[in-house]
Regions:
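A catalytic-pocket lid/entrance helix-loop region that shapes and gates access to the active site
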Residues: 29-71
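Flavin (primarily FAD) cofactor-binding/catalytic cores of flavoenzymes
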Residues: 1-11, 15-26, 33, 69-253
Length: 253
């Protein structure tokens, strides 16, 4: 069986003897899970951090205390260390034709996450299958047309396929709001997430905080909450306080 995929979640299918080809339409930031833990997260979130007296509440506060404007300067050294640590891994991926990046300004995963919420992948093993050639790769192309037993790609070539699996990542919160409520409300609220960094998929102007997250929006009584575990724990307190103040009739912005 031949399968065509549009992103890296492919290892489990390959293990069952499928002939897998992944289509990579644009460059992706890749970081190994263990490298991310040791070089970036470990000092804040690990058994060693807890043993040293750093609870997750303190770690959340420390992480949230860094202004987004200077966060790239904090992140670049860590991701430069990851580049050096996993240089052979990245070279094998590039040799296989995989398009890699570390963000517009080389600041790595977390800035991509905050700015656009896409374009990154935390690797737990599937990338080795791509690097080794066990999973075939076609990069820089998309699907032009789906045929009964094949795919015509945007470069004019044809790929035989019995099954196509779309694994194209995250959609926008604004798009979700349009589907859940209405396009009119989504347009009224405006873009959710992103900092206004004027980087790829995060147009300016600079906001200084995540757009429309955990604060009043242009639509009365509509609030947005999301993010990773740190953000969910930390900012849920501030969201809850704002809601409670309104329920109690307290004067609040």
């Amino acid at each position: 069986m031949t399968l065509a995929f549009i992103r890296p979640r492919i290892g489990k299918v390959w293990e069952h003897d499928a002939d897998v080809t992944m289509l990579q339409r644009s460059s992706t930031h890749i970081v190994k899970s263990d490298s991310l833990m040791e070089e970036v997260l470990g000092p804040l979130y690990s058994e060693e951090a807890v043993a040293g007296g750093l609870t997750h509440e303190k770690a959340d506060l420390l992480f949230a205390s860094i202004p987004y404007k200077v966060l790239p300067d904090f992140q670049r050294p860590a991701f430069e260390a990851i580049k050096q640590r996993d240089a052979a891994f990245y070279q094998k991926l590039e040799d296989a034709g995989f398009m890699l990046d570390f963000g517009d300004d080389e600041s790595g995963l977390f800035l991509k996450y905050l700015r656009r919420g896409s374009g990154y992948y935390i690797d737990v093993g599937a990338c080795d299958l791509v690097a080794n050639g066990d999973i075939k790769l076609r990069s820089g192309v998309g699907i032009e047309r789906i045929n009964p037993h094949s795919i015509t790609l945007t470069d004019g070539s044809e790929l035989d396929a019995d099954l196509i699996v779309y694994a194209t990542g995250y959609g926008s919160m604004n798009g979700w709001a349009a589907r859940l409520i209405s396009q009119e409300v989504a347009d009224k609220v405006g873009k959710c997430w992103g900092l206004g960094s004027d980087t790829t998929k995060d147009p300016g102007p600079w906001e200084g905080e995540l757009r429309n997250m955990w604060k009043p929006t242009q639509q009365e009584a509509l609030w947005f909450h999301g993010g990773n575990l740190h953000q969910s724990r930390h900012y849920s307190h501030y969201l809850a306080l704002q809601l409670k103040a309104r329920m109690e009739g307290l004067d609040t912005p």
